[in-house]
């Protein structure tokens, strides 16, 4: 008999939309609509290895001894009617704008069932037909780093338990995970980092 070893880390799996200016997902409304539909329809995978996330930053992480989740609350956006938001976001877009869109995930991540649920919800609610692409972890990491994806189901890690390291993965078009850029977000994160010395 052998036991399987499962390593746990401070990780949240999230949908990443490549939101560079040339991407169909440059529209914040479209990203929010698809994320809202996914959230409404996704169930925790049945493998028992995952739990539902209450926010991007996992429970239990601290900043200067203060639990981040207790202080920040639940920052998940409340999208009242993602279908209406989707219809509004689609104004002026053609179906051909979505050709070649794939949902990328690492092979052997245990999340194929979840990816199929999300993709099925987008098909049902939005008539969007994306393919699911599973690739080896090394290729997945390279494609995320280079921005060579349209949508990805990806692990967002707090290496060493650092909330700041986790949050710094967003907000910069050059070094961020999604191509999204917000100077105010980066300024606030920098101010907070300097105040805590992290």
Predicted regions and their residues:
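Solvent-exposed, polar/charged alpha-helical surfaces in well-ordered, non-transmembrane soluble domains
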Residues: 15, 28, 32-36, 84-87, ...
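Sec/Tat-exported extracytoplasmic proteins
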Residues: 7, 19-21, 37-49, 61, ...
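Extracytoplasmic/peripheral linker and loop segments enriched in polar/acidic and small residues
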Residues: 44, 128-140, 165-198
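Structural transition elements
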Residues: 48-92, 109-113
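Alpha-helical secondary-structure segments
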Residues: 11-59, 99-109, 197-198
């Amino acid at each position: 008999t052998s036991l399987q070893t499962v390593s746990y880390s401070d990780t949240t799996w999230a949908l990443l939309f490549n939101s560079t200016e040339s991407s169909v997902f440059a529209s914040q409304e479209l990203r929010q609509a698809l994320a809202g539909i996914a959230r409404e329809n996704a169930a925790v995978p049945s493998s028992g290895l995952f739990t539902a996330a209450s926010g991007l930053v996992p429970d239990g992480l601290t900043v200067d001894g203060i639990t981040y989740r207790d202080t920040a609350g639940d920052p998940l956006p409340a999208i009242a009617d993602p279908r209406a938001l989707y219809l509004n976001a689609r104004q002026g877009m053609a179906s051909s704008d979505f050709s070649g869109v794939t949902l990328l995930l690492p092979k052997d991540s245990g999340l194929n069932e979840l990816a199929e649920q999300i993709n099925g919800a987008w098909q049902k609610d939005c008539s969007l037909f994306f393919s699911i692409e599973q690739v080896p972890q090394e290729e997945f990491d390279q494609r995320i780093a280079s921005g060579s994806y349209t949508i990805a189901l990806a692990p967002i890690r707090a290496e060493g338990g650092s909330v700041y390291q986790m949050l710094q993965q967003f907000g910069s078009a050059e070094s961020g995970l999604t191509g999204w850029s917000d100077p105010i977000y980066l300024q606030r994160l920098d101010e907070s980092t300097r105040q805590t010395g992290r």
